[in-house]
Amino acid sequence: LQHETPNPWIEKESWLTKTDRAYTIQFGGFNLQSRMYDIDVLGYNNRTTKLHLFDVETVDESLVGDGIDFDKEDIKKNLTLFLYPDDSDDKGRILRVYQQYFMVSNAARLIIDETLARGGDLHKLNEYAVVQINDTHPSMVIPELIRLLMERGILMDEAIDIVSRTCAYTNHTILAEALEKWPIHFLEKAVPQLMPIIYELNSRVVKKFDDKSVAIIDDERRVHMAHMDIHYGYSINGVAYLHTEILKNSELNNFYKIYPEKFNNKTNGITFRRWLLHCDPELTALFESLIGDGFKKDATELEKLGAFVNDEAVLQKILDVKNAKKAELKDYLAKTQGIELNENSIYDIQIKRLHEYKRQQMNALYVIHKYFEIKAGKKPARPITVIFGAKAAPAYVIAKDIIHLILCLQELISKDPEVSPYLKVVMVENYNVTLAEKLIPAADIHEQISLASKEASGTSNMKFMLNGAVAIGTMDGANVEMHQFVGDDNIYIFGESSEQVIEHYAKADYVSRSYYDNDENIRRAIDFIVSDEMMAVGCRENLERLYNELLNKDWFMTLPDFEEYVATKERIYADYEDRMAWAKKMLVNISKAGFFSSDRTIAQYNEDIWHL
């Protein structure tokens, strides 16, 4: 089972520079003193910038008990102990409100102070600063900035206008956890000074629009943070083409009808200098020998590699680098985690946070399907190693059950002499960026199998693509744009479309049990979760709960896509055996990856939103 422990990632005091900047942050019934610290962040060509962090002077690490358990009610001492604390109860949820306000109040004060220090005019704040609200966690910056401007003598009407020209909102996902709705009594307890402003902002919306669905405060007396961002921000963007279209046409359609000019797309990108130059220097050196070093500054120059897609000498060198990285991963996992890999097997990797919509459970069901095939004598042409890297949110029970299933399969298969020579399951411990830098260059295949319409973008898909892994995926998130760039032959697409999925939800017509009853492969795989073999290595409570979830609910529709997923996996494994054709797919993916550089993303944000 997953067990959480604290990660003191800033334990070296040399990382942090304590500054003289401090603020008194006002909460309902008490104040807290904050202190600003700076971390120098190294950028391209040894340039640096500063990351400003705020801490509470009174934080007390002795509050932490077993794992990450701590006293959630002692706000003065626990406020900055843990990012995203367990929110399975009201104590954890209101702690998030305190944390979010602490962050935005400090940031808002810093913005105002720095504007004034530069001789700026707060009446023209939008000419000096842009606040990009990422998801709804920082949304209280809108009423807080209004409050601070009013404290300095600016009337409410003008303060609202100023802030509405200063703040922009990025929606990163349509999942409920990122579209926060805070009960009014939470806010009245934690940040009562904001409530008159929030009431006024809502009043203006209600007077202007008859549609109750766009109100900031709903009939259940909850404050919809995304609604506030949309009404009082000047830009709303999604993070991949499909995601933005879903926002406009479905999830936020009522707002799009009101403010079509505010909506725009900014497809995510990755720091390709980390995910290619840093973590795969051998591949970088090969590319430099072929096309020069211009791609190190401009990732779109990787397109020049397209000239070599039929050059077998180059293709062999790419395969040689991949094999070397696979051997490196084998050695690294053996030394650090005691995991033994077969470097001649196919490395089929899925690394991302554990969430039902990302459907690690479907990959696990495929492992069960393949286990049965091998038991029946149908052996793969080449051994397969299925590698998972994931962490579940502490309170996300089903996600933890999926991790438990994967760990059980790992143990069961490793001890089976009939199956283990041909199939291996690995769940790497404590998945993080350091591990990703080893896993991604070594991957042959990467899994991007989220339920269509649920993944806003994804970025692991881009990192794998840049390192020459080939994707199996749904038409979701940035997979859609990847498919447009590389074409049908160089990505393996399966599954229902986002339109079909959205229609299922609208009609409430999906019944998981009907797939179980009518498909022998599905029934056999799901039944195996609670089989005697699995119970011998696993925990009955976890396995039975996951079994019942898949059989009776399956909210993220694992089963409708399963048979096509199985068929697509078999096709991708078969295609892997033509090594030159596979190397060509690798090179096409790499040559088309330049678009997904964060340099391009940031330039588009600046051109269309920030105007810096």
Description of each model-found segment:
Residues 1-612:
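A conserved ligand/cofactor-binding region detector
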